[in-house]
Amino acid sequence: MRPSLSLRLVLPLALLLVVNLGACDLGQLTVRTTAKVLVRAQPSLQQESDYQLAHDALPGTLKTIEGFWFVDPENESLISLLTEGYCQYGTAFVEDDWEVAKFAKKLDEIEAHNARATHIFTRCLNYALKQLGDDWQRDLFGTPEAFAKVAKATGGDQRDAMMWSALALGSIINHNLSRVEMLSYLPTVKIILDRVLELDKARLPGRPDYAALPHVAYGMLYSAASAQFGGRADRAKLEFETALKLTSNPEHPDGRLLLARTLMGYRLGLMTNDRKFFHDQLKQVLETPPSVWPEQRLANEVAHRRARRYLSHEKELFQ
């Protein structure tokens, strides 16, 4: 029995529709598969031992991931990778270039790297806000009182996005200290960090570096100014030491996140004019191999790089 004319017409049309739908979704399907691979591959960068290789490779990696995100803009894995990636790129590399220019007193380069750092951390913040939703996007730059309610209502599933938003906003402020309106957002950064630490008291994140980062951020906030202008060396030291404790283990009781010790030695040494503390802490960093924490080898290479730089300028810093 031959199929009816209507059935013979419907079947090819249905097949054509399926093919077209498949073609429309093929890009997203490919990206979603790739995103899973990228998440699994992320530790390879964190374990990199060659600073310059990572410095040169990360921008291209981020732009590739951003291209995938453009195809699938709702992909949470890609947004998470971009959030962390831009914050880490800004901290490890762009700020390092900025700091090199500062010590060399190259004013044009200082200005250029300063502006670039602002742009990079703004990208990190924007991706974090995509994860955190409309209320955060609406109220982050509103009054601290209104925003505090939004932060308080944000649950533990958004803990990491909150952390990156605080680190990004704090870094943006740090690179725009001459803009009074930016300084007004310091209470907002503290609100976010307080909420993250409140969540951490109930349940620490599985990654020790994630547990330590809010304390590093607070250490930097408390050491950002002298005691005369609101800085608190005692509180900053406590926060840095907490970060080190959270990354310690029986084999390495002094902590494995060397960047926390580098920042503590440099910032508190200058803040309190304690040259011995400055020297001893940075010397301890250099006496600890970066491989002490293989999973965070790159961060420890950054710590060594900065410790060497600070010690090379010790005499002029304590004139």
Feature-to-residue mapping (PLM):
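Bacterial N-terminal signal peptides that target proteins for export
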Residues: 1-11
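Bacterial N-terminal signal peptides
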Residues: 10-22
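Bacterial Sec signal peptide processing site at the extreme N-terminus
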Residues: 21-45
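Extracytoplasmic and endomembrane cell-envelope/extracellular-matrix remodeling and assembly machinery
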Residues: 312-319
